[in-house]
Amino acid sequence: MKQETGKKRIIIAIDGPAASGKSTTARKVAHLLGYTYIDTGAMYRSVTLKALKQGVLDSLHHSPESVSGLLHDIVIHFEGDHVFLDGEDVTAEIRSNQVSREVSFISSLKPVRDRLREMQQHLGRQRGVVMDGRDIGTVVFPDAELKIYLVADARERAKRRHAELTAKSAEGVELPDLDSLEQEITKRDRDDAEREHAPLKKHPEAYEIDTSAMTIERQVEMVCQLARARE
């Protein structure tokens, strides 16, 4: 959608815990405003996938500093809704359960956060961007004109994750049940909030939106209204 002329292009930072609706909201808001959407979670998942493919995850758990070698020549880019890692389309692979289990650990490594923060800030220089993640409003773009913090109860987020996995998984593939997903999400919340570098937290200026009982259309509408008031 074409950006309206005569309006200031702003940076919209959307943060929140796993499966709170960040990516879906950010993608739809970007489309409606004619902005660029940048999925930072996909970037961390891409690094995690690369570690898995190279078989270095165990060694990273023992020697986290060795992650620098993994980041040396990494290339992550987006084409529409597709994510490319070193030239390969990994859109589906980065949503696997294995990646989901390890991404919090990879995200806790300072060299990873530093490298991806540089990439994210470079992508946001053009302004007119919607970026979602866990530290966008607090670390990557603390001066973003609009900061949003989405929350939802763990059970509701587990239901969303299950629906996402069901839609994207091949027929016959066994999926984790709701209780397992809820436990995984709760652990991810704890890991994200307690990590040493750039922990998940709400910026004092962020608007908190509880999406537990809210339609995606309504939360998108709320964010767009807040954004248009700042353009």
Swiss-Prot record:
One of its GO terms (biological process) is nucleobase-containing small molecule interconversion. The keyword Lipid metabolism does not apply. Keywords: ATP-binding, Cytoplasm, Kinase, Nucleotide-binding, Transferase. Residues 176-205 are annotated as: Disordered. InterPro entries: Cytidylate_kin, Cytidylate_kinase_dom, P-loop_NTPase. It is found in: Cytoplasm. Residues 184-205 have a biased composition (Basic and acidic residues). GO terms for molecular function: ATP binding; CMP kinase activity; dCMP kinase activity. Its main location: cytoplasm. GO terms for cellular component: cytosol. It catalyses: CMP + ATP = CDP + ADP; dCMP + ATP = dCDP + ADP. Its EC number is 2.7.4.25. It is an enzyme of class 2 (transferase). It comes from the Bacteria. ATP binds at G16, P17, A18, A19, S20, G21, K22, S23, T24. PANTHER family: CYTIDYLATE KINASE (PTHR21299:SF2), CYTIDYLATE KINASE/PANTOATE-BETA-ALANINE LIGASE (PTHR21299). NCBIfam families: cmk. Belongs to the cytidylate kinase family. Type 1 subfamily. This is Cytidylate kinase. It comes from Pelodictyon phaeoclathratiforme (strain DSM 5477 / BU-1). The gene is cmk.
